[in-house]
């Protein structure tokens, strides 16, 4: 067992005991609340995003310490292009800054960086930085940090279906070969386990087009805390709640 004396945000402290054998293999987080965090402090939204980037480092370290193998972060959705141009440009710059400032430490700690989503629309500078980080860390065996960039769950499924159809037409597979396991190989998350736990801070309770195929049996945990204020204690509380649920996967116990 892993024993922590912790507290949730500003609430009363409480003891959290985590069980190593019940640790989620894959945690996915919808990093929400940057704008609210900034507005509350009278700051521009871009400052909220910058504060949120610092939280990423904290949570990656915590996952490594706890033995969580896969961490997927919803960083930029296919719908985020609709935001004001200056905000989108600021987000692209933050991607580059994050990689330049953090990649050496991530690499030294064995973190493998990868992405899910379509990078083709990304500007050249952030795209090069991302690909460089992936190449630099490709042989690492620690936490697998997947950044969801220009990602949308519906888009991913449609893309996968199109690829399946193309392979059927080309004679590479037959219709009888198609099943859930095979279709998984046509998704961005190929080779990864489905998320055991999906966390969304900020008080919102929706999926926002995130991992729609993969979340069929995921457990969800919502928090009123905005992402820039989310910390290791909050992560442990989410895991504690997850470990005390009865996961039946559609069956009966």
Swiss-Prot record:
Question: Which residue ranges does UniProt annotate as crossing the membrane?
Answer: none
What is its biological role? Catalyzes the condensation of isopentenyl diphosphate (IPP) with allylic pyrophosphates generating different type of terpenoids.
Native source organism of the sequence: Clostridium perfringens (strain 13 / Type A)
Q: Which GO terms describe its biological process?
A: polyprenol biosynthetic process
Q: Where does substrate bind?
A: 33-37, 45, 49, 77-79, 81, 83, 200, 206-208
Q: What GO molecular function annotations does the UniProt record carry, in alphabetical order?
A: ditrans,polycis-undecaprenyl-diphosphate synthase [(2E,6E)-farnesyl-diphosphate specific] activity; magnesium ion binding; manganese ion binding
Protein name in the entry = Isoprenyl transferase
Q: Which residues form the active site?
A: 32, 80
The record, for Gene3D superfamilies, names: Decaprenyl diphosphate synthase-like (3.40.1180.10)
A family per Pfam: Prenyltransf
């Amino acid at each position: 067992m892993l024993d922590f004396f912790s507290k949730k945000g500003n609430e009363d402290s409480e003891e959290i005991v985590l069980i190593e054998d019940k640790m989620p293999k894959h945690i996915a987080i919808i990093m929400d609340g940057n704008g609210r965090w900034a507005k509350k402090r009278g700051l521009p939204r871009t400052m909220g995003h910058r504060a949120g980037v610092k939280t990423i480092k904290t949570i990656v370290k915590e996952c490594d310490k706890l033995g969580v193998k896969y961490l997927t972060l919803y960083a930029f959705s296919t719908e985020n292009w609709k935001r004001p141009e200056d905000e989108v440009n600021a987000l692209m710059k933050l991607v580059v800054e994050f990689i330049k400032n953090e990649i050496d430490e991530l690499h030294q700690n064995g973190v493998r960086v990868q992405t899910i989503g379509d990078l083709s629309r990304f500007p050249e500078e952030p795209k090069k930085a991302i690909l460089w980080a992936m190449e630099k860390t490709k042989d690492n065996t620690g936490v697998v940090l997947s950044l969801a960039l220009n990602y949308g769950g519906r888009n991913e499924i449609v893309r996968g279906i199109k690829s399946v159809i193309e392979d059927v037409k080309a004679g590479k597979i037959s219709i009888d070969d198609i099943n859930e396991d095979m279709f998984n190989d046509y998704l961005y998350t190929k080779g990864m386990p489905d998320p055991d736990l999906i966390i969304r801070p900020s008080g919102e309770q929706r999926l926002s087009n995130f991992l729609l195929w993969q979340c069929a049996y995921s457990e969800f945990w919502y928090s009123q805390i905005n992402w820039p204020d989310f910390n290791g204690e909050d992560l442990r509380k989410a895991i504690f709640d997850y470990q005390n649920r009865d996961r039946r996967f559609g069956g009966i116990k």
